[in-house]
Structures are given as structure tokens and as C-alpha cells.
Amino acid sequence: MITGILLAAGAGSRFGGDKLLFPLADGVPLGVKSGRNLLDGVDCAIAVVRLADRVLARLYEEAGLRIAYCPDAAAGMGASLACGVSAAPDADGWLIALADMPFIRADTIRSVAGLLRAGASIAAPRHQGRRGHPVGFAKDFLHDLTSLGGDRGAASLLAVHASSLQHLECDDPGILIDIDNRADLANIRHTPGADFRAQSLAGCP
């Protein structure tokens, strides 16, 4: 079983509001869209949230995701990642996804999960020479993932185990686009080859 781990415990301070609850043009909150896409591509998914994010947690539960509350979320992404993987220690592999990346296609996620099922140790999509998200790890990395902490996230493992990484070449610019601020939602309208412009915020200039 491949389990998706959605990292949704960040503060989102640069956005100027609760980023993951911000509605896209179709009315779906940004973070929920990311969760739905992840769940469509894996066997099950867990959303890692802060203890105070009860509204977000409820929306994720309604979307079909399990919830892992991370008491150490303020310490950084590594703590959130370790929390999520620890909630599914018996999985055959984990797909690590970011909740502020709502434009990754479900079929891309499904294909990355497929690489893990086919025996890849680490897998990630690549678009026009650039590696994106989500990143998948096989079960052999359980100890490494659950030992992460602070801001030491998956990138630190990729640096050490670069030779084990198998890329999925894809025509999906969404794997590279994370939403840090409201300007990012406007900028995606000008992304070459993007097929998600209609999903961006209707009110962006």
C-alpha cells in the first residue's frame, strides 16, 4: 500500500491569511484541492496539520483523508514529515506532498506511486529538466523519514541518496508550482503549457 503524506502544518505567513482555506475559482479551498488530488493517486492519504487547525482537519476528513496532528509543527517541515510517516509505519511506501501545491494532476501522482510499486527506492516527477513534487520513498526509508526533524525535510534525504532517485518525465507544470503568496495565484495564468488556469483565483489581477 502506498500512502500519501500531505504536509499541511505550515503557518503560511507570507500569504496574508489562512492559505490552505483560501478558495480557488471552483470554490474548493486550496489545501483541500491538494489533498483530493493526492488521494486520487494513492491508496490512502494522511494530512498532517497543526493542533489548532480543526477546521482544516474537518475538511480533510470530509475529503477522505486521515488526520495526523503534529504537536511539533512549528519546528519545521521535517517534524511534520516524520509525524505523517509515523502515522503509517506499515505502508509499502510514502508519497510526500505539499498542501500548497493544488495544481499537480492526479495522474502524475498516480504514476509516481506506480514507480514505487514497481520497485523504485525513491521516485519524483520531472518537468522540463526540473524535479518537482510529490516525492516517493519506499519502505526501506522508514527510519530515515521518521528521524527527520526541524527544517530537515525530504530534500536532505534526496541529497544523500541521489543515485537511488528514479524520475518520472511528465508534461505537468503543476509539479513545480507552490503557492506562497497571492501573487503566485495570478502568476500561474502565465505559465506556458498550464492547463489549470481556470482553477486559479477568480479575483486575481
Regions found by a protein language model. Give the residues of each.
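Nucleotide phosphate-binding site architecture
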Residues: 12, 22, 142-143, 186
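Conserved alpha/beta core of the MobA/IspD/sugar-nucleotide pyrophosphorylase nucleotidyltransferase superfamily
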Residues: 143-205
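Nucleotide and nucleotide-moiety/phosphate-recognizing core
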Residues: 1-99, 103-131, 163-170
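Alpha-helical scaffold segments in soluble metabolic enzymes
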Residues: 33, 37, 83, 111, ...
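Short glycine- and hydrophobic/aromatic-rich loop-to-beta-strand nucleating segment
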Residues: 133-137, 177-179
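Residue-level recognition of oxygen-bearing side chains
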Residues: 20, 29-30, 108, 140, ...
